[in-house]
């Protein structure tokens, strides 16, 4: 009997061991941002070869376009362009196709990795998102680009997943906006709101509205002279940006903010500025105000090929005075007028939440209107839903970045957001997850402090980790499985997007990235730039330099041996000139070290003399 028991025990142990071996062989869920909703792991890997083709269905021009984009991205990331073919796939191919599946929704997709990769979706947008997933998995295995065998089903919790950037107070170059579209697409973020006009605070400009900075960033033929001179977008540039975004399934929502934040308009036409509430408010009782704003919106909305190409336009409407009932009713009338005005051009209107702050009797259209729910004191979310508005969750207490301002966030608290937030949390108002009244979420950068030295690179250093984190929370919602620390470590293994390196990362670990014994005039390094956490050292022998003599130059910055104003060591970026209290005298031989990080100005170590 003991022998029988021993045999049974050995058989049980053998079975358990076999089960454990089988379980160990099943591939775990691959890391992707946003995290995959469903994963069924199998055994083994699919390793692409030189013969791997991208196959799309015969006659489907949209999937052909997506196949071409995928091939180009493979070339950018992996230095190989797969062949693109039409028709049926075979073993070793990556096969794109459309397939009805209601459970995947409008943007979902499915991937099956066996001896081939089959990517299917109900719509082309889902196929495109699926290609982003494949690229992210492959770029973590650059030696062989291996993809784990298994099955993916992935779909978003929320339809609008986005970012708003204030280009009014600080000019953001078009090249950066184009890169940001690519970054958003790589992380399945699909909405970019561009805030086109705003102004600084009067108290920082000698309490004088005439001296207070203000800008409108878009070329205007209707009002020549309105457009900012220190940086603007031509109509063609803005149209081309939207076309690029459309190719990547990202929607651009242009915002012309009124009737507050409008100092740029009253600088141009002083009679429409409010004498009572401040020149950054439009005079809502002046008929000329409406003529001006009608003309401005019309310029970008009319015609068969309007400047504002997308389905939605944001009309602003935040932070106007509610000093008395009369102006509140006029504000509500203004809001209703411009909702209907942009709808007259076939656009869906978006507004900032303000109707609790401006509570009144004058009706404001709610049906088919999207409200950016930013502060519950201005618009109580659940009351706004009762009135019929659809909401974008963009609570200021969680999702506002105001660089180096000392209020709101300099960097978002990504750990708290990852662990606790979804778009269902609109400040203290909490909705059921995936409540149809909540269309999605956004985070925002506001450049409140005009001229504070913050550069576009500084802004990006703040937004990129936030985007990676919020991409998860707006797509995957509460279904995350990785602990935050693991997510935060793994997110750094992914690039920003194919061909995009705004962070200036070189390699995956600290170390020497470039060394040259002698640097000849006009020579070039193999690196466009290096990001924060850098140190550059060099030996130099001084000469009688003329002001403006450059030592280094990149597309984004210049470092001067002799700056153009004082003849000192210094650097310029984004229109700011920063100088050190040091210059190199003729005949001096020095070793100079320059360091820069994300929280302080670039600084120079004490130069040491070289013999």
Predicted features, each with a name:
Residues 278-368, 375-377, 381-382:
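Active-site neighborhood of glycoside hydrolase catalytic domains
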Residues 103-281, 288, 294-312, 341, ...:
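Feature activates predominantly on carbohydrate-active enzymes
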Residues 363-369, 376-518:
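Flexible, acidic glycine-rich loops studded with aromatic residues
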Residues 8-18:
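Bacterial N-terminal signal peptides
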Residues 581-593:
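Trp-centered recognition loops
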């Amino acid at each position: 009997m003991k022998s029988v028991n021993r045999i049974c025990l050995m058989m049980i142990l053998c079975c358990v061991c076999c089960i454990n071996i089988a379980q160990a062989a099943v591939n775990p869920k691959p890391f992707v941002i946003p995290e995959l909703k469903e994963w069924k792991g199998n055994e083994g890997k699919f390793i692409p070869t030189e013969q791997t083709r991208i196959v799309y269905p015969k006659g489907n021009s949209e999937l052909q376009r997506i196949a071409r984009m995928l091939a180009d991205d493979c070339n950018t990331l992996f230095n190989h362009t797969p062949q693109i073919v039409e028709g049926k796939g075979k073993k070793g191919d990556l096969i794109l196709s459309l397939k009805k599946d209601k459970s995947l929704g409008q943007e979902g997709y499915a991937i099956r990795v066996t001896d081939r990769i089959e990517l299917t979706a109900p719509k082309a947008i889902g196929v495109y998102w699926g290609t982003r997933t494949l690229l992210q998995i492959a770029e973590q295995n650059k030696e062989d680009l291996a993809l784990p065998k298994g099955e993916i089903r992935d779909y978003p919790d929320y339809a609008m997943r986005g970012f708003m950037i204030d280009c009014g107070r600080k000019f953001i170059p078009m090249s950066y906006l184009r890169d940001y579209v690519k970054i958003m697409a790589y992380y399945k973020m699909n909405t970019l709101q561009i805030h086109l006009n705003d102004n600084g605070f009067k108290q920082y400009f000698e309490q004088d509205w005439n001296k207070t900075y203000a800008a409108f960033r878009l070329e205007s033929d209707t009002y020549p002279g309105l457009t900012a001179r220190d940086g603007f977008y031509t109509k063609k540039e803005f149209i081309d940006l939207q076309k690029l975004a459309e190719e990547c399934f990202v929607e651009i929502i242009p915002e012309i903010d009124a009737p507050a934040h409008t100092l740029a308009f009253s600088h141009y036409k002083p009679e429409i500025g409010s004498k009572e509430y401040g020149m950054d408010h439009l005079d809502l009782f002046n008929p000329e105000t409406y003529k001006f704003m009608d003309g401005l919106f019309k310029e970008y909305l009319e015609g068969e090929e309007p400047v504002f190409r997308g389905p939605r336009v944001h009309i602003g409407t935040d932070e106007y005075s509610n000093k008395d009932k009369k102006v509140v009713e006029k504000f509500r009338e203004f809001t209703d007028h411009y909702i209907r005005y942009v709808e007259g051009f076939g656009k869906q209107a978006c507004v900032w939440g303000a109707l609790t702050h401006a509570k009144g009797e004058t009706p404001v259209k709610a049906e088919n209107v999207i409200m950016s729910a930013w502060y519950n004191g201005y618009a109580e979310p659940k009351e706004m839903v009762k009135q019929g508005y659809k909401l974008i969750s963009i609570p200021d207490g969680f999702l506002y970045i105001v660089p180096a301002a000392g209020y709101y966030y300099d960097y978002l608290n990504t750990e708290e957001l990852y662990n606790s937030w979804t778009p269902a949390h609109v400040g203290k108002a909490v909705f059921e997850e995936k409540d149809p009244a909540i269309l999605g979420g956004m985070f925002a950068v506001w450049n409140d402090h005009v001229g504070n030295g913050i550069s576009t690179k500084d802004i990006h250093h703040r937004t990129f980790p936030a985007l990676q984190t919020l991409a998860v929370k707006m797509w995957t919602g509460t279904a995350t499985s990785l602990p935050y620390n693991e997510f935060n470590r793994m997110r750094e293994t992914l690039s920003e997007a194919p061909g995009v390196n705004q962070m200036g990362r070189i390699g995956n670990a600290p170390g020497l990235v470039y060394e040259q014994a002698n640097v000849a005039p006009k020579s070039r390094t193999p690196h466009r730039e290096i990001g924060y956490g850098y140190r550059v050292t060099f030996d130099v022998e001084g000469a009688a330099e003329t002001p403006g003599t450059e030592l280094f130059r990149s597309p984004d910055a210049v470092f001067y041996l002799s700056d153009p104003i004082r003849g000192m060591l210094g650097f310029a970026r984004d229109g700011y000139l920063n100088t050190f209290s040091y210059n190199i005298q003729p005949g001096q031989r020095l070793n100079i070290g320059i360091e820069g990080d994300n929280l302080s100005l670039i600084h120079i170590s004490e130069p040491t003399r070289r013999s």
